[in-house]
């Protein structure tokens, strides 16, 4: 669908859930005083006790207005929805599916899902075949009429950030973007060389696909011309 929305009433084939990977949890520490700052970049998950999670999930669900509530399991893992704005420059390759550029996608994930897994899930859903390393997930925060965008680490957990910030997207929202040119400077030379190999492979695949299409088209055209000029 062009909106990228996955409804609970839709057929299972169209309801997309990111693959869940379970990580060894760090022992829960004491809760931080005050509201956590959603603008501060974190490398790892800020783990809460089961009681703190239960309280926050209840508070979150009480504030939900679109029925996209979170569900808390007995093991302390919770599931819920995040909305991601797809701000891609162009489709990675021709596809009969609607373009993902500029649409809003609702994704059902677990509290154990990382940013890296969310990126991979979104790219799979929109049939984007380019490497996930070419994309980044940003959190967009709104504070006092100011908008702040911060790129998230691959090890962060988007659903935790959503839980802490609450359900309002005008307070916190997520955006998927392609890496800007200047951001490639952060990668090592072997990584950049690997990206080039991936691009070369994608370019070759596109070229071979184009050649096959035009070869088939030429063959059909020649067959049609042969039928026209065949003696009666």
UniProtKB/Swiss-Prot annotation:
Organism domain of life: Eukaryota
Entries under SUPFAM superfamilies matching the protein: Ubiquitin-like
GO biological process, any: signal transduction
Ras-associating domain mapped to chain residues: 78-180
Region Disordered: start-end pairs: 25-46
Keyword annotations: Acetylation, Cytoplasm, Cytoskeleton, Microtubule
Gene Ontology cellular-component annotations: cytosol; microtubule; plasma membrane
Residue span(s) of domain SARAH: 181-228
Modified residues (N-acetylserine): 2
Subcellular location, record wording: Cytoplasm; Cytoplasm, Cytoskeleton
Basic and acidic residues biased stretches: 37-46
Pfam families per the UniProt record, alphabetical: Nore1-SARAH, RA
Any one GO molecular function term: identical protein binding
Protein name: Ras association domain-containing protein 3
Organism, scientific name: Mus musculus (Mouse)
Lineage: Eukaryota, Metazoa, Chordata, Craniata, Vertebrata
């Amino acid at each position: 669908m062009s909106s990228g929305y996955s409804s609970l009433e839709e057929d299972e084939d169209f309801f997309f859930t990111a693959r869940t990977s379970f990580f060894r949890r760090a022992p829960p520490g004491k809760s931080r005083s005050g509201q956590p700052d959603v603008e501060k970049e974190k490398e790892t998950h800020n783990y809460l006790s089961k009681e703190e999670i239960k309280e926050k999930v209840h508070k979150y669900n009480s504030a939900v207005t679109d029925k996209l509530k979170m569900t808390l399991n007995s093991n302390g893992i919770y599931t819920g929805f995040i909305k991601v704005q797809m701000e891609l420059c162009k489709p990675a390759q021709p596809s009969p599916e609607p373009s993902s550029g500029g649409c809003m996608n609702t994704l059902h994930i677990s509290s154990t899902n990382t940013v890296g897994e969310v990126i991979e899930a979104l790219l799979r859903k929109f049939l984007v075949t380019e490497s996930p390393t070419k994309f980044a997930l940003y959190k967009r925060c709104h504070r006092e009429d100011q908008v702040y965008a911060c790129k998230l680490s691959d090890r962060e957990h988007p659903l935790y950030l959503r839980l802490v910030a609450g359900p309002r997207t005008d307070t916190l929202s997520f955006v998927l973007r392609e890496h800007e040119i200047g951001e490639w400077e952060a990668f090592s030379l072997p990584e950049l060389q690997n990206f080039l190999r991936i691009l070369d492979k994608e370019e070759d695949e596109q070229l071979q696909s184009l050649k096959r299409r035009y070869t088939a088209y030429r063959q059909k055209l020649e067959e049609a011309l042969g039928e026209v000029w065949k003696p009666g």
